[in-house]
Amino acid sequence: EELIYNQYHFNYYLVNPALAGAEPCSHLMVSNKMQWAGMKDFPMTQLLSFKTRVWENVGIGAYIFHDRNGYTSKAGGQITLAYHIPLSRGRRYSKKVSYDRQLSFGASFKFSYFYINDQLFIDDPDAMQDIAFNNTDGFLPNANFGIYYKSYGGFVGLSLTNLVPLAADIYGDKELPAPFTGFLFGGYTFDLGARKDKYLEPMAMLKMNQYLEVNMDLNLKFGHDVDEDWGYWVQASYRHCWNVNNIQAMVLQPMCGFRIGKFQLGYAFSLALNNLVTQNYGTHEIMLGYTFCYQKHFCR
């Protein structure tokens, strides 16, 4: 499973390339995720992403990441080109382009590089003689495609990833190709209050791969735009996995975020409802973002 997809709560572009430039803002984000904190050599993932609109109907996006899990590491990235078709003449956010109703398409080229850390051979010199470690790295390209539609408060997206069934030659053998996977999500933003400075956003996401392994996320977010200088949001999320081999079959994830000027700060905590609960302190994620223009609510 691509670890970065689990960070979509802070940036929907991570699961759907059509989100590149879909919102009236340019967004830069850096995040750090620590899984199963408290256990030795717990996994850790760092991510840097950017998305913006460069012309009236064209958006671009990119991210790079690094993941460490024990002696193995993975690095990679993605570059995206998206096209947005306005479907209304509203002027809610911009004097030039309408973002109220919009249909977007996006395609990405992505790549991953796998390698074994040298620390393995320091801790276990005999590993140098193991033929399984004759080839300790591998490069794997792939592609994604996505569609995104928004109509005022409603939004829905469909994306397909790992479109090319390529396998990396690593650990002395061919690895299985990354599974062809689809994401379907949808939600609605309800404006609340006389000034409509508060909002409630229910959202659901369904993920399924070619092996019929299914994840379903149910999310409920509440936000308050106190003024143009700052705001906050809180969210409760629940994930259920229809895959008996997934040790995170059920996951609870509360999270919160703040907007201070053009800066955005977010924190998420995940707790898997399984036997590992008593052996670790859950998964922690911190996000810092910056928007280059004012965007009502949180930039998807």
Stretches with model-predicted labels:
Residues 1-300:
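Subset of outer-membrane beta-barrel
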